[in-house]
Amino acid sequence: MRPKISIIGAGFVGSTAAHWIASKELGDVVLVDIIEGVPQGKGLDLLQAGPIEGFDVKITGTNDYSATAGSDIIVVTSGAPRKPGMSREDLIRVNADITRDCISKAAPLSPNAIIIMVNNPLDTMTYLAKQVSGFPKNRVVGQAGVLDTARYRTFIAMEAGVSVEDIQAMLMGGHGDEMVPLPRFTTISGIPVTEFISKERLDAIVDRTRKGGGEIVNLLKTGSAYYAPSAATVQMVEAILRDKKRVLPCSCYLEGEYGLNDIYFGVPCVLGAGGVERVLELPLNDEEMALVKKSAEAVSSSIAALKAM
């Protein structure tokens, strides 16, 4: 029997993720959305691409959560984007309501699933998903660092004039302006990145990475990134379903790692069939640790705002 992946939210990120999951034949896909006709139409459209692209999986579009029963993975992409004039608290309130609704309906139907959160504010919504689902910490994880690291690697490859395939990089922290790219742990085919790029240019790349999502929002005018976010999500899905033990930066629940507690935070982890199989603690220097602490304060503040609601 093929694995079953349920994607909650049939917007750009959800439907693009469904496409890549199907094309990689990672499993059968259930696409869920509250808008009648949208998941059904996108699901049917995607199914009809199968004969052309050469994939053969079952794709179901639905407004009914019962179709998600027995899922191996639940991906939550549904959420409202931050609009002009909207405070961080406003965004938390709106998306917390959506997340509670999605998780309370999907989790009981798939008690052994692994949940991958993709909606924003990412670390806070992942924290909420763990609370609402009651799942153990290893089976609730947030997708942020894979995307942020991909942006970082892309900018480094552009600057160095080399293949993006040869950039190895790590990034930590909350998904936002306080993320912590780690140049000291960045190499080009094992060669320190500082052999290719000056500190000044590297600092500029780090800054651009932090603002990576906003840069695309500003260019699009309406909407936000979806190709890279969905690709990042599918990389995590594949790592879990194929038990690849990938070392990826993900939003994980911490209990003492890096001196942090009761927080979802972007850290390197081993991702496999058990979900987050272990968190890796890097030997950070004082400067890096200070940036991590600052980032953690921003995430903790967001989680505190959630708890106060």
From Swiss-Prot:
<dbReference type="InterPro" id="IPR001557">
    <property type="entry name" value="L-lactate/malate_DH"/>
</dbReference>
<keyword id="KW-0816">Tricarboxylic acid cycle</keyword>
<feature type="binding site">
    <location>
        <position position="151"/>
    </location>
    <ligand>
        <name>substrate</name>
    </ligand>
</feature>
<dbReference type="GO" id="GO:0004459">
    <property type="term" value="F:L-lactate dehydrogenase activity"/>
</dbReference>
<keyword id="KW-0560">Oxidoreductase</keyword>
<feature type="active site" description="Proton acceptor">
    <location>
        <position position="175"/>
    </location>
</feature>
<feature type="binding site">
    <location>
        <begin position="9"/>
        <end position="14"/>
    </location>
    <ligand>
        <name>NAD(+)</name>
    </ligand>
</feature>
<feature type="binding site">
    <location>
        <begin position="118"/>
        <end position="120"/>
    </location>
    <ligand>
        <name>NAD(+)</name>
    </ligand>
</feature>
<protein>
    <recommendedName>
        <fullName>Malate dehydrogenase</fullName>
        <ecNumber>1.1.1.37</ecNumber>
    </recommendedName>
</protein>
<dbReference type="InterPro" id="IPR036291">
    <property type="entry name" value="NAD(P)-bd_dom_sf"/>
</dbReference>
<dbReference type="InterPro" id="IPR015955">
    <property type="entry name" value="Lactate_DH/Glyco_Ohase_4_C"/>
</dbReference>
<dbReference type="Pfam" id="PF02866">
    <property type="entry name" value="Ldh_1_C"/>
</dbReference>
<dbReference type="GO" id="GO:0006089">
    <property type="term" value="P:lactate metabolic process"/>
</dbReference>
<dbReference type="InterPro" id="IPR001236">
    <property type="entry name" value="Lactate/malate_DH_N"/>
</dbReference>
<dbReference type="InterPro" id="IPR022383">
    <property type="entry name" value="Lactate/malate_DH_C"/>
</dbReference>
<feature type="binding site">
    <location>
        <position position="33"/>
    </location>
    <ligand>
        <name>NAD(+)</name>
    </ligand>
</feature>
<feature type="binding site">
    <location>
        <position position="95"/>
    </location>
    <ligand>
        <name>NAD(+)</name>
    </ligand>
</feature>
<comment type="function">
    <text>Catalyzes the reversible oxidation of malate to oxaloacetate.</text>
</comment>
<feature type="binding site">
    <location>
        <position position="82"/>
    </location>
    <ligand>
        <name>substrate</name>
    </ligand>
</feature>
<dbReference type="Pfam" id="PF00056">
    <property type="entry name" value="Ldh_1_N"/>
</dbReference>
<dbReference type="InterPro" id="IPR011275">
    <property type="entry name" value="Malate_DH_type3"/>
</dbReference>
<dbReference type="GO" id="GO:0006099">
    <property type="term" value="P:tricarboxylic acid cycle"/>
</dbReference>
<feature type="binding site">
    <location>
        <position position="120"/>
    </location>
    <ligand>
        <name>substrate</name>
    </ligand>
</feature>
<comment type="similarity">
    <text>Belongs to the LDH/MDH superfamily. MDH type 3 family.</text>
</comment>
<dbReference type="GO" id="GO:0030060">
    <property type="term" value="F:L-malate dehydrogenase (NAD+) activity"/>
</dbReference>
<feature type="binding site">
    <location>
        <position position="88"/>
    </location>
    <ligand>
        <name>substrate</name>
    </ligand>
</feature>
<keyword id="KW-0520">NAD</keyword>
